[in-house]
Amino acid sequence: LQPLFVFLRRSVAEPATPAGLAGRRLVMPLEGSASAQAAEDVLARYGVTRENAHMSFLRIGDAAAALQRGEHDAGFFMLAPDNALIRRLVADPELVLYPFTESVGISRNIDYLQPATLARGAFDLRRVLPPRDVALVGATVNVIVREDLHPAVVYALLHAMNEVHQGQTLVSNAGQYPSQTG
């Protein structure tokens, strides 16, 4: 599961819902990416659009750096929770990981997103990062192959994906992913 992480500058009052991000400076994933689409889909459900928020679409590393420099009020990142960039942002004392308290409701309105929880202390038990359970939404990553791909290659791909991804992550249980259909 690839969660959608939203980080706020600590100096920005945490809005009760994402609707409170209207009028803010938001750094978004690259325009046209699935990550940007997910972020814009969630924001649109709360009435936040390009017309009423200042959205900048940057590459992930540039987006994180701009957020950390204070050039934006909030940043949207859709990455695996064990990604080094996510860990860096979680550990930044000037940033707060924003919870989607309506994660189940979001997943009922946007069918490709699923609710997930990042447990308190999941990143660092000693420093207790994050300092609270954080409700998130995320999307599964799909691998689609051509119908004429040789079955042995398909089997090898499935075997490799199981080897790499079958373990527990910070937001999913062991064996939950990958799942095969078709």
What positions do the PLM features span?
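Extracytoplasmic
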Residues: 1-3, 21-23, 92-95, 138-140, ...
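Short intrinsically disordered coil segments
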Residues: 20-24, 112-115, 158-160
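Bilobed "Venus flytrap"/periplasmic-binding protein-like clamshell domains
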Residues: 2-65, 69
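Residues in well-ordered beta-strands of folded domains
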Residues: 7, 98, 144
